[in-house]
């Protein structure tokens, strides 16, 4: 990561990666908190470095409606954060093999919800109701993300459109009547 240092690093991994390996044998879950000015849907992520394999559960993403749990002085746990997850924004995904672009990619196919705040990081069992007690550790260095944004459709009010059409028709008839 760009200038990011994992403070629970001491066991031989990379201190610049997010992981789900705790210091001294315990578990912790490192995640990036991303903030956007508008609600977006995460489409994919690319990683420059990946260590570990946990099949289809190597990356966890979650859209949040609030980041109050992360504010200074907040006494929060991961269970507190789960209450802020937006519907249809939570998912666990595998990371593919290194592509021709030199990146490992993960596509978030089942996310349909959007949010202004997103967590993305190593697989987090707290957010998985079907989590097994035993899983392999994963370490990731995030390179880029892909997002999409639903553009609101511009609606035209019917009374205004009908009045404008009526005025246009009236002018056409008036011009036609003057010529005759």
Q: Model regions: which residues?
A:
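N-terminal targeting leaders for non-cytosolic proteins
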Residues: 1-28
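The right-handed parallel beta-helix/beta-solenoid scaffold, focusing on the short coil/turn
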Residues: 30-32
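Extended extracellular/luminal ectodomain segments enriched in beta-structured repeat modules
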Residues: 37-44
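Solvent-exposed strand-to-loop "edge" motifs in beta-rich extracellular domains
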Residues: 46-52
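Short, surface-exposed beta-strand/strand-loop-strand elements in extracellular ectodomains
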Residues: 53-70
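Terminal, low-complexity interaction segments
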Residues: 73-154
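A short, hydrophobic C-terminal helix/tail in secreted or cell-surface proteins
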Residues: 157-175
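Short, charged juxtamembrane terminal tails flanking transmembrane helices
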Residues: 177-180
